[in-house]
């Protein structure tokens, strides 16, 4: 896993690690910040949107057409 500013690279990780690391990263960024998440775990197609809905973050865009899934989320409240 690598983090480059507002990119969270979760490739090669499997559930539950992606959500745990996403939660940690969300705590570290400021409200209004957009985060790009990269993953190759099929469970994240379901898990990340559910996480955003539950935690009230904006899921701005999803791209699951390639083998690397991309999610753009915006932190919308303080954790």
Swiss-Prot record:
Its main location: cytoplasm. The active site is at residue 15. Disulfide bonds: none annotated. GO terms for biological process: tRNA wobble position uridine thiolation. It is found in: Cytoplasm. One of its GO terms (molecular function) is sulfur carrier activity. Keywords: Cytoplasm, tRNA processing. One of its GO terms (cellular component) is cytoplasm. Pathway: tRNA modification. Sulfur carrier protein involved in sulfur trafficking in the cell. Part of a sulfur-relay system required for 2-thiolation during synthesis of 2-thiouridine of the modified wobble base 5-methylaminomethyl-2-thiouridine (mnm(5)s(2)U) in tRNA. Interacts with IscS and stimulates its cysteine desulfurase activity. Accepts an activated sulfur from IscS, which is then transferred to TusD, and thus determines the direction of sulfur flow from IscS to 2-thiouridine formation. Also appears to be involved in sulfur transfer for the biosynthesis of molybdopterin. Belongs to the sulfur carrier protein TusA family. Interacts with IscS. PANTHER family: SULFUR CARRIER PROTEIN TUSA, SULFUR CARRIER PROTEIN YEDF-RELATED. This is Sulfur carrier protein TusA. It comes from Buchnera aphidicola subsp. Baizongia pistaciae (strain Bp). The gene is tusA.
């Amino acid at each position: 896993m690598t983090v480059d500013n507002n990119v969270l690279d979760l490739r090669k990780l499997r559930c539950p690690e992606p959500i745990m690391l996403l939660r940690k990263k969300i705590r570290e960024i400021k409200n209004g910040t957009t985060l790009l998440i990269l993953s190759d775990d099929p469970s994240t197609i379901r898990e990340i949107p559910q996480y955003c809905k539950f935690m009230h973050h904006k899921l701005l865009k999803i791209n699951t057409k390639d083998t690397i899934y991309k999610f753009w989320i915006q932190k919308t409240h303080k954790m």
